[in-house]
A protein has these predicted regions:
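A solvent-exposed interaction/effector surface
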Residues: 1-150
Length: 150
């Protein structure tokens, strides 16, 4: 995660220098994750209201994210617990006979992060695991509020 959070200030500086408005929370889209090789390819993203165009040699690119269904897991607390949160999402997929989709993005959205509070217990990260589209499933998790997975 240290590499991820080193890159966010660079992206924010680009936004400031070019008067680009950010309309959402910072996020990471995981493009490729090689577990045996312990290598990950990812994109640092900030949401903007309209598409921009950058020069071909720019480190910054712009694109659109298509809608897809996903299992959402909310991690409250330090990022050191993210593996456990991801594992719970994958376990939920297995327990409910859902199937992971190869067309959606695996993402983390940093709803409340280190730039807003230095208290890790207050950090909120939303994890999205893409699944094959089905009708929305209403679920109720013990000691939680009801939610709809879309």
């Amino acid at each position: 995660y240290s590499k991820v959070f080193q890159l966010f200030p660079k992206m924010q500086l680009f936004f400031e220098e070019n008067s680009i408005k950010n309309i959402g929370h910072p996020m990471v889209i995981f493009d490729n994750y090689n577990v045996p090789g312990n290598k990950v390819s990812f994109s640092i993203c900030l949401q903007i209201p309209e598409e921009i165009f950058t020069s071909p040699d720019s480190e910054i690119t712009c694109g659109k994210r298509l809608n897809y269904q996903a299992v959402k897991v909310t991690l409250k607390g330090d990022y050191s617990h993210s593996k456990e949160a991801w594992d719970k999402g994958f376990a939920y997929i297995k327990a409910t006979n859902l199937q992971e989709s190869e067309t959606g993005n695996y993402m983390e959205i940093y709803v409340k992060n280190f730039s807003q509070t230095h208290r890790p217990s207050e950090w909120i990260t939303e994890i999205y695991i893409p699944v094959i589209a089905t009708s929305p499933i209403k679920t109720e998790v013990p000691n939680s509020t009801p939610s709809v997975i879309e």
